[in-house]
């Protein structure tokens, strides 16, 4: 191990000497027609049509073949320039930081976990806790039966640090013998990297990974102790996900520079532990160091509600997808069923007509609008009225609508103040601001979210708003039913870590202000 670490250190030292100049080089992936890279435009169109029809909801898609982007699309209001939260796909980036720290000789796979935290380790650690190593954190074999109860939803209710909470949590199994998908274990990896480097994982990866790959201002949330969350909370753009996949596809090599030791890439993406036996499940193919093994001899990082970086070495391909889905296997099945058969070994004849069809379809992608009319006979009579609600857990005190202006507007009043949400008609209108729809406390939702809204009268007395948090997988469908002096407000999310349907609110009209 010592000899391997020394070899890694030499690689990293050479990298850091040249990194400053290299980081200035454009990292954008080249573009190509699908046919030049062995894929039919017609087959790609079939994939996009199926994704748009059957998946609710795709947010973005980038396909890279032979190092070239051959197709890319964003479902409006999502766009290429807005970062998207990755959830557990963040884990693969934390793994990369661990690999680089090992390469620099700052830690090893066999280091005891508790050795890094003498002040937060229980006075009499159990045999299994003492036996836990860095490699056990990486391969989700910590010996825990349940995840440590870290309060990511409300850190103020947790008195111990996240590290201390993990270390005092029960370890009933011998580390290395029991697979448990374990986000607090990834947080511990982040904490260890910060201990040995003096930098957060985010700052540590900036010159070593993010800048060389051309990532623009990646954002990563932290614990109350100022440690990068590690397991989740990284936000980047879809092409940046694809570049990360390309880096791993090419064993850590990028534009002629070895950013990550090839030996680490091999270890991280190989099976380090078995995690199931279902042949058709992409969650039962084995687990590496914060990477999943997948069918078709491939591997991936993935995150909640359908964030994917799929790497398919045998086809020299990377698929980057962001989405907001409940069934993540459905999206992977679509890739296996539609994209894999489309990838041929050699170039195909150009098909300009099919390519134009594909490009037009990609340019027109959008999250589906609510169906209904642009106006109602009630529009003028309810416009400007305030509907007040009894105290509720969502913190909404009152709402009002402006239907008389050219731009319909929803005004929401909470204890924090008043927010105006511009609503498009068969288009998306975007703005930033607080909007209490029950998602603010959900993991990784920005404090000042980018909100895109569109609306329609789904019936004569019901106005339906679809509200997308465009840096996340989330959208909410809000139904406002006007019934005389009453307003019945129903809301449902596409996905959530808890209930998707929120408690109904009943509002009562008061005098116009």
Segments (PLM) and residue ranges:
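Active-site SXXK
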Residues: 45, 67, 84-110, 137, ...
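Active-site-proximal alpha-helical segments within enzyme catalytic domains
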Residues: 185-192, 232-253, 307-324, 336
């Amino acid at each position: 191990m010592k000899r391997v670490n020394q070899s890694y250190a030499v690689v990293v030292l050479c990298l850091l000497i040249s990194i400053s100049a290299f980081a200035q080089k454009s990292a954008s992936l080249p573009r190509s027609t699908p046919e030049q890279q062995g894929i039919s435009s017609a087959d790609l169109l079939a994939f996009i049509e199926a994704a748009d029809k059957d998946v609710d909801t795709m947010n973005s898609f980038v396909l890279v073949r032979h190092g070239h982007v051959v197709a890319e699309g964003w479902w409006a209001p999502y766009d290429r320039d807005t970062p998207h939260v990755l959830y557990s796909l963040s884990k693969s980036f934390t793994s990369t930081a661990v690999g680089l720290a090992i390469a620099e000789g700052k830690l090893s796979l066999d280091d005891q976990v508790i050795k890094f935290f003498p002040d937060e380790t229980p006075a009499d650690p159990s045999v299994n806790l003492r036996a836990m190593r860095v490699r056990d954190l990486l391969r989700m074999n910590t010996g825990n039966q349940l995840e440590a109860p870290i309060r990511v939803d409300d850190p103020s209710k947790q008195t111990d640090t996240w590290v201390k909470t993990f270390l005092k949590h029960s370890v009933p199994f011998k580390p290395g013998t029991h697979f448990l998908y374990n986000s607090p274990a990834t947080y511990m990896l982040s904490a260890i990297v910060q201990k040995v480097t003096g930098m957060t994982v985010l700052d540590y990866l900036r010159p070593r990974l993010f800048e060389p790959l051309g990532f623009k201002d990646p954002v990563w949330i932290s614990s109350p102790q100022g440690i990068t969350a590690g397991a989740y909370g990284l936000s980047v753009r879809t092409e940046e996900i694809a570049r990360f996949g390309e880096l791993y596809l090419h064993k850590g090599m990028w534009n002629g520079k070895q950013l990550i030791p090839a030996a680490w890439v091999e270890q991280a993406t190989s099976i380090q532990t078995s995690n199931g036996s279902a042949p058709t499940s992409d969650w039962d193919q084995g687990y590496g160091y914060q990477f999943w093994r997948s069918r078709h001899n491939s591997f991936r990082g993935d995150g909640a509600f359908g964030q994917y970086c799929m790497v398919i070495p045998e086809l020299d391909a990377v698929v980057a997808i962001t989405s907001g889905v409940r069934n993540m296997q459905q999206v992977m099945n679509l890739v296996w069923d539609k994209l894999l058969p489309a990838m041929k070994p050699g170039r195909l004849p150009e098909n300009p007509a099919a390519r134009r069809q594909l490009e037009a379809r990609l340019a027109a992608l959008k999250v589906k609008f609510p169906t209904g009319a642009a106006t109602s006979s009630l529009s003028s009579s309810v416009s400007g009225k305030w509907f007040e609600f009894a105290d509720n857990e969502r913190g909404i005190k009152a709402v009002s609508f402006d239907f008389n202006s050219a731009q319909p507007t929803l005004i929401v009043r909470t204890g924090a103040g008043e927010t105006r949400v511009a609503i498009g008609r068969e288009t998306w209108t975007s703005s930033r601001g607080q909007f209490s729809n029950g998602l603010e406390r959900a993991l990784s939702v920005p404090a000042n979210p980018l909100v895109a809204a569109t609306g329609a009268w789904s019936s004569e007395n019901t106005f339906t708003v679809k509200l997308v948090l465009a840096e996340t997988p989330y959208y909410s469908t809000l139904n406002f039913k006007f019934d005389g002096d009453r307003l019945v407000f129903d809301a449902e999310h596409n996905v959530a870590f808890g209930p998707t349907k929120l408690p109904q609110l009943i509002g009562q009209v008061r005098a116009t202000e």
